[in-house]
A protein has these predicted regions:
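Conserved C-terminal alpha-helix-loop-beta "cap" of PLP-dependent enzymes
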Residues: 147-170
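Conserved PLP-enzyme active-site core in the AAT-like
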Residues: 1-138, 143
Length: 170
């Protein structure tokens, strides 16, 4: 942290390592240095984590991933803790013209209705997949936090990524 630092940007679950961190010490550090805390909550979603209630000032979501849920909308969501931030970001938002169409807004609203079901199912599937991959000779390491539907794999050097993907049955 330097005198020029204005904010801490935190991914509670890193990508692609899938390492989950305890964000509480960062909230304390931010308050101590009067910094904004910005959380990228894309992997956890509002269903699994509510950073504004935990101490964050700004929370970001890639709505394209879980919130939309059907790969038919490209969007992001920014939520803020207080009116001052909302007004500042709202002015910026208007200046750059970053608004969703009515259809994209509808698609995100539709996605929110089933978010809890999709998150629960993706967690179950990811846990089962992670367990199976841990026993595969072609995989050296499974990178999985245990809390989301996302995981990463490190293939054994003797195995080709292209061949692995070609033989993957979904």
């Amino acid at each position: 942290i330097t005198p020029q630092t204005r904010a801490l940007f935190i991914e509670p679950i890193s990508n692609p390592q899938m390492i989950e961190i305890d964000v509480e010490p960062y909230y304390i550090l931010s308050k101590k240095h009067q910094l904004l805390t910005i959380i990228d909550n894309t992997f956890l979603t509002p269903y699994l984590s509510t950073p504004l209630e935990e101490g964050a000032d700004i929370v970001l979501h890639s709505a394209t991933k879980y919130i939309g849920g059907r790969n038919d909308v490209l969007a992001g969501v920014v939520t803020v803790k207080d009116e001052r931030l909302a007004e500042q970001l709202g002015q910026f938002h208007n200046m750059i013209g970053a608004t969703l169409s009515p259809l994209d807004s509808y698609l995100l609203q539709r996605g929110l209705k089933t978010l809890h079901l999709r998150i629960d199912r993706s967690q179950e599937n990811a846990q089962r997949l992670a367990e199976r991959c841990r026993h595969s000779e072609s995989i050296d390491e499974v990178l999985y936090s245990g809390r989301t539907g996302m995981l990463s794999l490190r293939l054994n050097k003797a195995f080709s990524v292209a061949k692995f993907l070609e033989n993957l049955d979904i």
